[in-house]
Curated annotation (Swiss-Prot):
P700 is a chlorophyll a/chlorophyll a' dimer, A0 is one or more chlorophyll a, A1 is one or both phylloquinones and FX is a shared 4Fe-4S iron-sulfur center. Chlorophyll a' binds at residue 675. The gene is psaA. It holds the Pfam family PsaA_PsaB. The chain crosses the membrane at residues 70-93, 156-179, 195-219, 291-309, 346-369, 385-411, 433-455, 531-549, 589-610, 664-686, 724-744. Keywords: 4Fe-4S, Chlorophyll, Chloroplast, Chromophore, Electron transport, Iron, Iron-sulfur, Magnesium, Membrane, Metal-binding, Oxidoreductase, Photosynthesis, Photosystem I, Plastid, Thylakoid, Transmembrane, Transmembrane helix, Transport. The lineage of its organism: Eukaryota, Viridiplantae, Streptophyta, Embryophyta, Tracheophyta. Belongs to the PsaA/PsaB family. This is Photosystem I P700 chlorophyll a apoprotein A1. PsaA and PsaB bind P700, the primary electron donor of photosystem I (PSI), as well as the electron acceptors A0, A1 and FX. PSI is a plastocyanin-ferredoxin oxidoreductase, converting photonic excitation into a charge separation, which transfers an electron from the donor P700 chlorophyll pair to the spectroscopically characterized acceptors A0, A1, FX, FA and FB in turn. Oxidized P700 is reduced on the lumenal side of the thylakoid membrane by plastocyanin. It is found in: Plastid, Chloroplast thylakoid membrane. Gene3D superfamilies: Photosystem I PsaA/PsaB. It comes from Agrostis stolonifera (Creeping bentgrass). Chlorophyll a binds at residues 683, 691.
Length: 750
């Protein structure tokens, strides 16, 4: 008989077949709620259906069930993303001029959409060069594809099919992990394991495999492309991977294989893992060898980070211990209790993630132009403007979302009885001081930033240019920004002795990179005009934060409504008979925050668009003379409100306004239509519910008279529904108007 030690018990972390798969639910709209499942009595039903369909908290109070629904929905989201990506790649394969663009990216514009002639729409197919007629695209996919080493439309086609397969796989996973093997709550709360897997797996191995792809596939293919080799002559990706001699012809150290790695002679690899800084003068993008080096380094960091947290082996960090040790002399209990909050409230978790991701997205927007990562991206001005604008809007929305979910956490998940003297409790206890100080800052910034402009407008109108704030009269130079620029410009050889050039040409240093006679990037001068508009940025950002933070800190209670938590996340007023208590819910703060976010981002993208056209983008003559698109007018024109209206909005709108009859005419129609959508929003925002209810009742009377009254009783939108429809159209109209204005302008002149 053999005596064995008892086997360690394996934790079962899934439930088998918890929810029956049935399509019957699909036929019962509102099946998740007892009230909605009864069907519509009034037209309010359809609005409530939309409002609550994804509010899993309202379907059940069981955290495990909520977690499973969210987890499953994430797979659905990934499936849609793969489907969308597949569509992008399919368009590149089937309807684009990618191969032609690859052969001459400086003279041929990217296009992946050809409009069918039905009743004259083929006018939209403009000549993008090389004899191809289509819509010029500004998504940056062509540049991304070239950087990743795609040389033919067949490769794009195969990738599109691959993405479709992945979309199907994700759809299956979403079904499987809800209906067949659903994780237990403990699995969702195992944060150390999650951190290890996400850091080492997603970020670590993800970066490592991308670095591997770049070294073995992208670098050699881009070497050939830069040297002018016909894409059809270049070996296929798998040939580089399977045949080391091919790579060794381009990078001799490949002949030695992994020997330098194991003998610690790493400098051998310096020919394809570089640390150059600056831009490649051939393509105007970052050096791809720098990018490969970066991803390898990032991979190492994340692989190490993914082994830091304590799971089955009893070594490493525990998140709870880290958080509870995190307290200083002035912070009471510090982060004690935060672990419990973040493992039981997904709103709190989501709020943090949205805030981080939103900030990161805005950082990405700025890096995309200052350090353009892909070949021929920097000289494609339409794409540069689109990428910046897109990432700024997305970042703004994510940050407002962070405040929204923080407020939902406060209302639904925060338990004041168990929290005492931790950081969150301390912030809530001195919220009046925080909000009143922030309010003072907003008033100060608003009056002073606008005051500088109004002063300039007045002096300009009185014909007293010598009394204006400008680079040629009373200077307000942004000395701190210039100091930061200078530090970075002089870093190579000083604080960064290994680098040959500074991280970005925008810092200064005098050099300019031009590709095919177009400026890719040059040092960006900052002056009084930038100082003024930066204070407008500070103002709009602080007001957005004031509104959102007030919504979070006063989500549960306020002096006006001490029992606000009982009223929920969104409510119109504190009941009848209490005047002056409308628009105080956390939801209303998010609503107002969205408008200020829109203000803030609009000023940023206007600043960027004009500054780049004035001081960066343009052409360069054989003698080295740079001619900018708007001839450097930013410094003198943007220092008055009138200048912004006349020389930016009005002057640059001429392309979109005069686009009729040209291939840009769709932008003219969008410009008009989006203005209409925006104006339509005002009808919802500036009108009371009672007005519409009265109108509806007289229309219902007429229907009754004619015996055609519907069974479902018509109702005016509730106050909150009306505001939701209003803000949606306001933002949609505003963003689409800006999009049409920017693109018609930059495609025409860029």
């Amino acid at each position: 008989m053999i005596i064995r030690s008892p086997e360690p018990e394996v934790k079962i972390v899934v439930d088998r077949d918890p929810v029956k798969t049935s399509f019957e639910e699909w036929a019962r709209p509102g099946h998740f709620s007892r009230t909605l499942a009864k069907g519509p009595d009034t037209t309010t039903w359809i609005w409530n259906l939309h409002a609550d369909a994804h509010d899993f908290d309202s379907h059940t109070g069981d955290l495990e069930e909520i977690s499973r629904k969210v987890f499953s929905a994430h797979f659905g989201q990934l499936s849609i993303i793969f489907l969308w990506l597949s569509g992008m790649y399919f368009h590149g394969a089937r309807f684009s001029n990618y191969e032609a663009w690859l052969s001459d990216p400086t003279h041929i514009g990217p296009s992946a959409q050809v409009v069918w002639p039905i009743v004259g729409q083929e006018i939209l197919n403009g000549d993008v060069g090389g004899g191809f007629r289509g819509i010029q695209i500004t998504s940056g996919f062509f540049q991304l594809w070239r950087a990743s080493g795609i040389t033919s439309e067949l490769q794009l086609y195969c990738t599109a099919i691959g993405a479709l397969i992945f979309a199907a796989l994700m759809l299956f996973a979403g079904w499987f992990h809800y209906h067949k093997a659903a994780p237990k709550l403990a699995w969702f709360q195992d944060v150390e394991s999650m951190l290890n897997h996400h850091l080492a797996g997603l970020l670590g191995l993800g970066s490592l495999s991308w670095a591997g792809h770049q070294i073995h596939v992208s670098l050699p293919i881009n070497q050939f492309l830069d040297a002018g080799v016909d894409p059809k002559e270049i070996p296929l990706p798998h040939e580089f991977i399977l045949n080391r001699d091919l790579l060794a012809q381009l990078y001799p150290s490949f002949a030695e294989g992994a020997t330098p790695f194991f003998t610690l002679n790493w400098s051998k690899y310096a020919e394809f893992l570089t640390f150059r800084g600056g831009l490649d003068p051939v393509t105007g993008g970052l050096w791809l060898t720098d990018i490969a080096h970066h991803h390898l380094a990032i991979a190492i960091l994340f692989l190490i980070a993914g082994h830091m947290y304590r799971t089955n082996w009893g070594i490493g960090h525990g998140l709870k211990d880290i958080l509870e040790a995190h307290k200083g002399p002035f912070t009471g209990q510090g982060h004690k209790g935060l672990y419990e909050i973040l493992t039981t409230s997904w709103h709190a978790q989501l709020s943090l993630n949205l805030a981080m991701l939103g900030s990161t997205t805005i950082v990405v927007a700025h890096h995309m132009y200052a350090m353009p990562p892909y070949p021929y991206l920097a000289t494609d001005y339409g794409t540069q403007l689109s990428l910046f604008t897109h990432h700024m809007w997305i970042g703004g929305f994510l940050i407002v979302g962070a405040a929204a979910h923080a407020a939902i956490f406060m209302v639904r998940d925060y338990d004041p009885t168990t929290r005492y003297n931790d950081l969150l409790d301390r912030v809530l206890r001195h919220r009046d001081a925080i909000i009143s100080h922030l309010n003072w800052v907003c008033i100060f910034l608003g009056f002073h930033s606008f005051g500088l402009y109004i002063h300039n407008d007045t002096m300009s109108a009185l014909g007293r240019p010598q009394d204006m704030f400008s680079d040629t009269a009373i200077q307000l130079q942004p000395i701190f920004a210039q100091w930061v620029q200078n530090i970075h410009a002089t870093a190579p050889g000083v604080t960064a002795p290994g680098a040959t050039t500074s991280t970005s040409l925008t810092w200064g240093g005098g050099e300019l990179v031009a590709v095919g006679g177009k400026v890719a990037l040059l040092p960006i001068p900052l002056g009084t005009a930038d100082f003024l508009v930066h204070h407008i940025h500070a103002f709009t950002i602080h007001v957005t934060v004031l509104i959102l933070l007030k919504g979070v800190l006063f989500a549960r209670s306020s002096r006006l409504i001490p029992d606000k938590a009982n009223l929920g996340f969104r409510f119109p007023c504190d009941g009848p008979g209490r005047g002056g208590t409308c628009q105080v819910s956390a939801w209303d703060h998010v609503f107002l925050g969205l408008f200020w976010m829109y203000n803030a981002i609009s000023v940023v993208i206007f600043h960027f668009s004009w500054k780049m056209q004035s001081d960066v983008w343009g052409t360069i003559s054989d003698q080295g003379v740079v001619t900018h698109i708007t001839g450097g007018n930013f410094a003198q024109s943007s220092i008055t409100i009138n200048g912004w209206l006349r020389d930016f909005l009005w002057a640059q709108a001429s392309q979109v306004i005069q686009s009729y009859g040209s291939s840009l005419s769709a932008y003219g129609l969008f410009f008009l239509g989006a203005h209409f959508v925006w104006a339509f929003s005002l009808m919802f925002l500036f009108s009371g519910r009672g007005y519409w209810q009265e109108l509806i009742e007289s229309i219902v009377w007429a229907h009754n008279k004619l015996k055609v009254a519907p069974a479902t009783q018509p109702r005016a939108l509730s106050i909150i529904q009306g505001r939701a429809v209003g803000v949606t159209h306001y933002l949609l109209g505003g963003i689409a108007t800006t999009w049409a204005f920017f693109l018609a302008r930059i495609i025409a002149v860029g």
